[in-house]
């Protein structure tokens, strides 16, 4: 396929136009008084959002060269979103400012490679300064403040602080759409997985259609259980102990299942059978998680255990197990806390090492189930458009709060960057083009604060000058249009979000500035429509 090429200054200017198109669409959403962007959808109602990455993902430009610039800037937003889950608009604004400043320097004769080296060094120095300025998230109020700033809603902030309070920093918090108007929290303690009872005859509470076992023994079996002869020796020991039995196996069928059901109906003893969750290797891993949590062993031939030869020593225990038709919850497993902690650390190491997003998500789920519990935030709103917008904000706030717990918090509202670049005052001791690169980053660092102010209807240049004169931790609160101690006012940003935004923006801006050639496919010329012959008059014989 033929290509079109663009070189040097023309190439960089085309990229800049693309960056501007995307960044101008995104930056209006920045700050507490940021505006909304309406996105047209092929079907259904349009989406209204102020989430930077959602806007960025929708932008495709007509000019292929400009589109390259827009797509590269989109990468800034998505990468920041992947790492920190928030701060996508800040990253886009920083990238645009660095591209503008950098191109001005290149046009004036600076060497792009020298510029890039200076920019990278500056980003690293500012990142370190941000980390040093950070303080740990100590209280529930801190979490509520971070979530409130991210979601622009104090009710959501309080709700998320409560959620993190309950599940801890490793716990899973999921956001779901609700049919009601309000937003509420549902908490599941213990380990929950989505498999229910094999037969509804196991139900102990007919009103709620639940099977509840208090202080049961837990049998974990890797294969299928169909022959009752395999199960009988163990069953007899369990009946003698007087405790109920919870069975988790690939399947329980045939006479083994009917024996359990008949004994349950007669009241001889209480048991519930459930199919094990997931498939393949993940099933084995989850069974091992449950074994660690309950202090039992997985009965499997590969570890030399056969069902008809084992006793009570392989069974796990828990305070209670609740089984519905769709899911099972194990509360207070009797496993050794040290073993559970070891298992948690092992899964954390796997999370670090995996390249697959899907694997990472599934590992995080396993981690949460072992480490704390699961919180579901049910989001409600008057219309579907509002519901989607609210859900976006809450998802961002969850990510921001998690990032804050991880690396700590700094003063928000763009002021942390303005103060952190003071470490660049001597150009890091660099000279020439590298020093110019440092200045590019120093100038760009004002832009997020400037746009937060501009979107609030205040002159951004006046605000950035004033904030620079104030001490560390002080800044401009765009919601109240006052200057002051932002930390005390609860205007906080997670360091991880601000740092990721800066590092990713510097990376992409550096790539754009050092670009010399663009290569795109030549658009195909549309062929004129063929004349309408070809109406065959064939007759079937």
From Swiss-Prot:
Gene Ontology CC terms, in alphabetical order: cytoplasm
GO aspect biological process, one term: protein refolding
Source lineage: Bacteria, Bacillati, Actinomycetota, Actinomycetes, Propionibacteriales
Name recorded for this polypeptide: Chaperonin GroEL 1
Keywords: ATP-binding, Chaperone, Cytoplasm, Isomerase, Nucleotide-binding
Family named by the database record: Belongs to the chaperonin (HSP60) family.
Function per UniProt: Together with its co-chaperonin GroES, plays an essential role in assisting protein folding. The GroEL-GroES system forms a nano-cage that allows encapsulation of the non-native substrate proteins and provides a physical environment optimized to promote and accelerate protein folding.
Principal location listed in the UniProt entry: cytoplasm
Known EC number: 5.6.1.7
InterPro entries: Chaperonin_Cpn60_CS, Cpn60/GroEL, Cpn60/GroEL/TCP-1, GroEL-like_apical_dom_sf, GROEL-like_equatorial_sf, TCP-1-like_intermed_sf
Broadest EC class assigned to this enzyme: isomerase
Catalysis: reaction(s): ATP + H2O + a folded polypeptide = ADP + phosphate + an unfolded polypeptide
Intracellular or extracellular location(s): Cytoplasm
Complex formation: Forms a cylinder of 14 subunits composed of two heptameric rings stacked back-to-back. Interacts with the co-chaperonin GroES.
Top-level lineage group: Bacteria
Binding site for ATP: 29-32, 86-90, 413, 477-479, 493
GO MF term set: ATP binding; ATP-dependent protein folding chaperone; isomerase activity; unfolded protein binding
């Amino acid at each position: 396929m033929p290509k079109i090429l663009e070189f040097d200054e023309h190439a960089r200017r085309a990229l800049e136009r693309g960056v501007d198109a995307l960044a101008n669409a995104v930056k209006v959403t920045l700050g507490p008084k940021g505006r909304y962007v309406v996105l047209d959808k092929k079907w259904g109602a349009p989406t209204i959002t102020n989430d930077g990455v959602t806007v960025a993902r929708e932008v495709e430009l007509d000019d292929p060269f400009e589109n390259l610039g827009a797509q590269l800037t989109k990468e800034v937003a998505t990468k920041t979103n992947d790492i920190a889950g928030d701060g996508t608009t800040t990253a886009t604004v920083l990238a645009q400012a660095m591209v503008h400043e950098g191109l001005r320097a290149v046009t004036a004769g600076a060497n792009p490679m020298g510029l890039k080296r200076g920019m990278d060094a500056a980003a690293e120095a500012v990142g370190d300064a941000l980390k040093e300025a950070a303080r740990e998230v100590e209280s529930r109020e801190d979490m509520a403040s971070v979530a409130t700033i991210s979601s622009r809603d104090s009710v959501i902030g309080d709700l998320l602080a409560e959620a993190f309070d309950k599940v801890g920093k490793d716990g899973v918090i999921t956001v779901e759409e609700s049919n009601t108007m309000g937003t509420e929290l549902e908490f599941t303690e213990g380990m929950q997985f989505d498999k229910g009872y094999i037969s509804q005859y196991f139900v102990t509470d007919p009103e709620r259609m639940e099977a509840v076992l208090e202080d049961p023994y837990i049998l974990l079996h890797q294969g299928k259980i169909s022959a009752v002869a395999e199960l009988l020796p163990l069953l007899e020991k369990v009946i003698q102990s007087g405790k109920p039995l919870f069975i988790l196996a690939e399947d329980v069928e045939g006479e083994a299942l009917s024996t359990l059901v008949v004994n349950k109906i007669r009241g001889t003893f209480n048991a519930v059978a459930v199919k094990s969750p997931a498939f393949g290797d993940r099933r084995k891993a989850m069974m091992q998680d449950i074994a660690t949590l309950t202090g039992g062993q997985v009965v499997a031939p590969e570890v030399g255990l056969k069902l008809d030869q084992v006793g009570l020593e392989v069974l796990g225990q828990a305070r209670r197990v609740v089984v519905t038709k769709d899911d099972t919850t194990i509360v207070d497993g009797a496993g050794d806390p040290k073993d559970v902690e070891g298992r948690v650390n092992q899964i954390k190491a796997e999370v670090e090492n995996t390249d697959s997003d899907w694997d990472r998500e599934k590992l995080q789920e396993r981690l949460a189930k072992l480490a704390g519990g699961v919180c579901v935030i049910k989001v409600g709103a008057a219309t579907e458009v509002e519901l989607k917008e609210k859900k976006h904000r809450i998802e961002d706030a969850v990510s921001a709060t998690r990032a804050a717990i991880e690396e700590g918090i700094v003063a928000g509202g763009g002021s942390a960057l303005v103060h952190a670049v003071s470490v660049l005052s001597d150009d890091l001791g660099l000279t020439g083009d590298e020093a110019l690169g440092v200045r590019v980053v120093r100038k760009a660092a004002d832009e997020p604060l400037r746009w937060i102010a501009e979107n609030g209807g205040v002159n951004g240049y006046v605000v950035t000058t004033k904030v620079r004169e104030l001490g560390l931790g002080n800044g401009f609160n765009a919601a109240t249009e006052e200057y002051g101690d932002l930390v005390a006012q609860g205007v906080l940003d997670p360091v991880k979000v601000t740092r990721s935004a800066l590092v990713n923006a510097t990376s992409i801006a550096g790539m754009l500035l050092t670009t010399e050639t663009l290569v795109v496919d030549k658009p195909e010329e549309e062929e004129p429509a063929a004349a309408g012959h070809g109406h065959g008059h064939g007759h079937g014989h």
